[in-house]
A protein has these predicted regions:
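Immediate post-signal-peptide N-terminus of mature secreted/exported proteins
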Residues: 1-26
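Surface-exposed patches in mature extracellular/periplasmic domains of secreted proteins
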Residues: 25-33, 79
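Compact alpha-helical subdomains of small soluble proteins
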Residues: 36-93
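Short, solvent-exposed segments of well-ordered alpha helices
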Residues: 4, 22, 29, 55, ...
Length: 93
């Protein structure tokens, strides 16, 4: 039985997002919106980095990085929960 495998993006966070989307997880929509907000933050930073004070730029960058890392970990865990639920559904076999 041939299966069309989804190619990796070579970015663990993006791959986890893709897995969550493909699994029709209800968390995908919320996490996707959060990812867009963080991306908008990076766009703001890149647009204004030459006119921001160095401390402000450093603190804002750290905050964005922390938010992105936290979100990627939440997405990773949500993917684990999907697999856990799939395994649970096999118990009666």
């Amino acid at each position: 039985m041939p299966v069309n495998a989804i190619a990796s993006s070579n970015n663990k966070c993006v791959d986890n997002f893709n897995f969550l989307r493909q699994s029709s997880s209800d968390r995908y929509q919320k996490y996707s919106q959060d990812y867009i907000k963080i991306g908008n933050g990076y766009t703001f930073l890149n647009t204004n980095k030459n006119i921001m004070g160095s401390d402000a730029k450093e603190v804002y960058t750290m905050k964005l990085d922390m938010k992105l890392d936290s979100l990627c970990n939440k997405v990773d865990y949500a993917g684990y929960q999907v697999i856990k639920d799939k395994m649970q559904s096999l118990q009666g076999i």
